[in-house]
């Protein structure tokens, strides 16, 4: 990288500089495009390539995985390709990408959002390991598997697992390193969103993590007793009172979703009123 930077600084009129070398039995090409340093490995077909490494300048908050570099279509992201790019916040992965290597986005400390296009079938082991600010991940319906520790330590993660996913690896979601002992522990107030009866629900149950099917839950049943009644309304009012007086809230993410009947992202007296209306309707057989 230092040699490449020296070459770039010496040729000011050139916006893209390339160098080639042999590695992994594939031709390696390094180039700079719009101040971003890329290294690719050309596949045997002579048309496609794997993105081996990427260095994004500190000024780059958003990045899109290129569809083409040096005339080659990029079809894969290699192991650790984006790892350690500490300033990038948003990454978009296009439909041309068919595979991703392990640890590809590991320790991207400022990463908050990732968007996948349809085409990816697997998120490998440690793919987003230790991305503490990662919150939004838009997964494609083509996805089949999520590898071991794929989102380990992603404490802010809030995403929905498509029903197409049939296998989820160990510690893939909702887990982080235990603070006072060896091993892993469930992230506080973590919630897995998925489909009832799917691999995501199975994973949540096995690991003691809250689960919700966003298309199939009992609205208002915040105490999880399989009925929406006055007890739920009382719980919602108690939560609202805490929030209003500055006392720490006690509802989990799951309870906040279930208790927010009017969809304004706030659990308050309006929601309690709607819960009571549901209870009254159910009680009278309406």
Pin down the residues of each PLM region:
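Ser/Thr/Pro-rich low-complexity tandem-repeat tracts
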Residues: 107, 119, 130, 142, ...
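Short, aromatic/basic amphipathic alpha-helical patches
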Residues: 199-208
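Cellulosome-associated attachment modules in secreted, modular CAZymes
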Residues: 18-21, 215-286
